[in-house]
Amino acid sequence: MAQVGEIFLIALLFFTLVFVLNWIRLRRQVRPFRKYGLAVGTVLILFEIVSVVLFFESLRGVSLFSILLADGWTFIRLAAFTIVGTYYAWQSGHLAFPLLMRRFPVTPAAQSAAGSASPAASTAPLQPPPNGPPSLAGVNLTPPAVGEATPGTIRLDDQSPLPARENAAATLPVMEMPSRPSVTPPQALGATLIVVAGALLYTVVLFTVTTPRLSQIVRSLTDFDTAQLGLGSTVTLATLLLVLQVGFAEEIIFRLGIQNFLAVHFKWQGQRFRIAIAATAALWAMGHSGMLDPDWVKLAQIFPVGLALGWLYDRFGIESAILAHGLFNVAGLILTPSLIS
């Protein structure tokens, strides 16, 4: 399954470069979302610092310059996935951070500074559309002459999602609150716990029936590396923090970033968003190749979990997906010695 891992690494590198370049290319449009990216990047750096301190013995011999370089790249990468991913989420009709955005909303003034709201916009906080592409309310629609399409004109009979071109984000209207305000934090927490419990039950049954073993590659890794994979045999504060960090970063990259990127660029909004969920879950599962023997067991475990996390994001936002992933990783770390040879 080495080829699966290579394909995954190439795909991840591709998406990383795309998001970093889009952060630069769309800097005006994504400006209102920078605060979320800086917050996520800072949280990841704090995780990295604590992990380095706790795993100092395992990292002995690694130069300080290498650690600082890796941490700097981690900050840039996660900030790019957060900022651009939140922008794509906005376009696909999602509140990326429903709890955080209610506390720190994107205002019309911020979007006006990004060139995407009219000066006469309301002072109420901006919210994404109920489902799918944003409404045309507030957009200047100039119908072209019959049989003629004027550059920059929005055709009244054009059913393509907005913004359909890279300049269309500059004319985004003030958007309405999505039709999910009735979802309360207790409901989100309840759904999160149900997803975690279901994923753990499925994992226990699958591993009990198939009796997998750690692959030769994983057995040769250090405690720091195996903890990053959630396969360490020793549960300590260091390994717990590390699996939480991995879950946090993976949800930002896959569910917030790649999933919304696919939804926008392949027009998988609305009911078709489930296609983006499945595609992202498949890519995420490929990243876990080579951990167990036989290899298919890990893929069979991870793909359904990815579907559940994708649904959780779609329904309750990235905070719920991050919490579910973190709890699943912690529980998996505890259960690993009894489930895997």
Locate predicted features.
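Feature marks short, highly hydrophobic, charge-poor N-terminal signal-anchor/signal peptide-like helices
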Residues: 1-8
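Alpha-helical transmembrane spans of integral membrane proteins, capturing the lipid-embedded, hydrophobic core
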Residues: 8-15, 41-45, 78-83, 192-204, ...
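N-terminal signal-anchor/start-transfer transmembrane helix
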Residues: 9-28
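Juxtamembrane "helix-exit" motif on the non-cytosolic side of transmembrane helices
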Residues: 24-25, 52-63, 208, 289-290
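Membrane-interface helix-boundary motifs at transmembrane edges
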Residues: 25-36, 266-271
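A generic, lipid-embedded transmembrane alpha helix
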Residues: 37-59
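Juxtamembrane helix-loop-helix connectors linking adjacent transmembrane helices
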Residues: 59-76, 92-125, 130-140, 145-247, ...
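Transmembrane helix-loop-helix hairpins at the membrane interface
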Residues: 232-341
